[in-house]
Amino acid sequence: GNSRVHNDDCEAFVYWFIEQAKAHGCETCIFLGDWHHHRASTNVSTMNYTVSNMERLGKAFEKVYVIMGNHDLFYRDKREINSMEFIRNIPNIHIVNDWIVEDDVAIIPWIVGDEWKKIEKMTQKYVFGHFELPYFKMNAMVEMPDVGGIKTEHFANCGMVFTGHFHKRQQMKNVTYMGN
């Protein structure tokens, strides 16, 4: 949200996260999408928190990949406008608005159109994204229905898949929703 309490909680998490990552020797950070919640009304205070925390992450890690989730996008069905463009020039920050596939790693933003059809051919060992997969719980009670698009089975040739989007931590086959 846009509240000071929410932003303070998120900032406290960033401090904790950096401390934990450093204790485990992590050099790269991959944020799995939806940094902002309100795609049409992110206020100036929230934007200031965003800049300070992205600068903090950029100093703590060699590379920070910020995946564009559906809430970071102005339109749900295209990625042409996002709420994170203003952090693009912070050192070590990489906004993921297009697919990145390098060697054993794929980093994929919110999928639009029929992009999901490319996933079945992928063989990457690690896939990071912001996926809306059926049969996972959207919250504690409600399961995502199958709407005829991307499915967990499409990742069968991949190793481990880590995704944002649903807020409940859960796992099915090789796909893990990290939750929040």
Where are these regions (language model features)?
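Active-site glycine-centered loops adjacent to acidic/histidine catalytic or metal-binding residues
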Residues: 33-34, 69-70, 130, 164-165, ...
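Core catalytic region of metal-dependent phosphoesterases/phosphodiesterases
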Residues: 2-100, 154-158
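A structural signal for the main folded, soluble domain(s) of proteins
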Residues: 14-16, 22, 113-115, 120, ...
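Short, glycine/charged-enriched secondary-structure capping and boundary segments
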Residues: 44-47, 79-83, 120-121, 140-144, ...
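Conserved beta-sheet core of the metallophosphoesterase superfamily
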Residues: 133, 139-180
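Binuclear metal-dependent hydrolase catalytic cores centered on His/Asp/Glu-rich metal-binding motifs
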Residues: 99-153
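Hydrophobic/aromatic beta-strand patches that form the interior of the parallel beta-sheet core
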Residues: 30, 65, 96, 106, ...
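Short, solvent-exposed loop/turn segments at secondary-structure junctions
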Residues: 36, 72, 111-113, 132-134, ...
